[in-house]
Design a protein with these regions (language model features):
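A broadly conserved amphipathic alpha-helix scaffold signal in soluble, globular proteins
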Residues: 44, 90, 97, 101-104
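Short, glycine/charged-enriched secondary-structure capping and boundary segments
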Residues: 43-46, 68-71, 122-123
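NTP-dependent small-molecule kinase module
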Residues: 100-166
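A structural signal for short, well-ordered beta-strand segments and their strand-loop junctions
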Residues: 29-31, 54, 106-110
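A glycine- and Lys/Arg-enriched "phosphate-lid" helix/loop adjacent to the NTP-binding pocket
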Residues: 50-96
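Short glycine-/polar-rich loops that comprise or flank the Walker A/P-loop
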Residues: 25, 48-53, 76, 102-105
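Conserved nucleotide-sensing/catalytic segment adjacent to the nucleotide-binding pocket
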Residues: 1-47, 51, 83
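Conserved nucleotide-binding/hydrolysis micro-motifs of P-loop NTPases
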Residues: 35, 58-64, 113-115
Length: 166
């Protein structure tokens, strides 16, 4: 089996496990880029029977993603094309905005800090916390907090504030 077949097989397996969890009304945790439409549609449907909680880690730019993938490949990890990374970087954030009203909770983290190999990696920074439609962080009335939101996350934070119940 070549790498493309292995990736397709792994994706199909993960999707079927998510579908089974939704059908069985059981808990399920998984990782996704949220870059396509299939998982977004499944999560939208799941929100009718489940509390969908999402921890979303984002980066400042597709170029930072590309650099991290190159580092991963250099250490034996799998490759993703630059074109695919750029497509997913935009699509993922748009899909998240569409899903916002369906999520029971969203915690959005900025994971853009880069460190030299061998150095401690700092924790991602919480940028947005929304629970039951209420924005807990950032405080939209605090100019410093709003200015601290990284540019890549601003459309998501703005959408959450527009849709906020409080």
């Amino acid at each position: 089996m070549d790498i493309a077949e292995a990736n397709a097989c792994a994706w199909a397996h993960g999707k079927s496990r998510l579908e089974a969890a939704i059908a069985n009304r059981s808990n399920h945790a998984f990782e996704t880029t949220l870059g396509g439409t299939t998982i977004s549609r499944l999560l939208e449907g799941a929100s009718k029977t489940h509390s969908v909680v999402m921890l979303y880690c984002g980066l400042d730019s597709p170029e930072l993603h590309i650099a991290r993938v190159k580092m991963r490949v250099a250490h034996g990890g799998h490759h993703i094309s630059d074109e695919k990374i750029r497509e997913r970087w935009d699509a993922s954030r748009l899909n998240l905005i569409k899903l916002l009203p369906r999520l029971s909770r969203l915690q959005l983290f900025n994971n853009s800090v880069s460190v030299e190999p061998g150095r401690d990696i700092p924790d991602p920074v919480l940028v947005l916390d929304v629970e039951s439609g209420r924005v807990n962080c950032p405080d939209q009335h605090d100019a410093a907090a709003m200015n601290a939101v990284p540019p890549w996350a601003r459309p998501i934070v703005e959408a959450a504030i527009r849709g906020s119940r409080a």
